[in-house]
Amino acid sequence: MTDSDVAADPQEPDSLSWREQAVARSLDSARLRAETRVQRFLDAAIELFNSGSGKDFTVQEVVDRSGQSLRSFYQYFGGKHELLLALFEESVRTTTEYLRVKVTDEDDPLERLHTFVVEYYRVCRPTPEQGATVPGRAPFMAEFAQQLLTEHPKEAARVFSPLVTLFEEVLDGAAAVGAVRAGPGHGPIVGVVLEAIMFNSFSSTIAGLSVDPGGQGTAEDLWDLIFHGIGTGATS
């Protein structure tokens, strides 16, 4: 085996998601059992988050709610940080799937971009009251994203890659019809726009305004701001 063969090994840790790394700690023969156990820990953590404790729950609380052992938890996760990463990764994945369905429903490339911006904004909105949910909502997405981007940029890049890929596809489609500016600058634009959508979803909270459950009006305002920043004016 050559050095290049080793480098190309698909099981390199950096190529695996946090959830996959947790499951990979188990023997292949027990993979299905490991998948089930990991999912039970993730489900327990989501329940705790939704119960109002946010991400301030303890590992022991997750263990107790999952009905499993502390020893089992540390078989799959190095600690609470890895559990939060796995949760956030699942949030990004489900959000990306939701957004892909929404943009696929649109035929016009510019309307696909419009739909992506508005729907992603709605997904990132803080829930104004218990029971008011948006399909595809990502638990603690904006809050944990800020911490992740600041303290662990390499991990953040991995976690956000599915969402970034989808947005690049949508942006390229709009550029192809001349609706937005084309060129090599799309890389920075992707990051700036995604960040603007995610963190502007809390603008009402910052300004001390009441939170609109749907957030549609504010989402459209943000779309106007973004489009006038990157649009060409060729398509209305």
Model-based region annotation:
Residues 1-36, 234-236:
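N-terminal intrinsically disordered/low-complexity leader segments
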Residues 34, 38, 84, 88, ...:
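Amphipathic, non-transmembrane alpha-helical scaffold segments
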Residues 34-45, 62, 87-91, 95, ...:
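Generic hydrophobic, amphipathic alpha-helix propensity
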Residues 40, 48-82, 86, 90:
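Helix-turn-helix
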Residues 42, 114, 118, 164-172, ...:
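An amphipathic alpha-helix signature
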Residues 86, 100-130, 187-190:
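Hydrophobic alpha-helical connector segments
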Residues 122-169, 176-180, 188:
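Short secondary-structure transition hinges
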Residues 131-135, 153, 157, 175-223, ...:
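Hydrophobic/aromatic-rich alpha-helical bundle segments in the mid-to-C-terminal region
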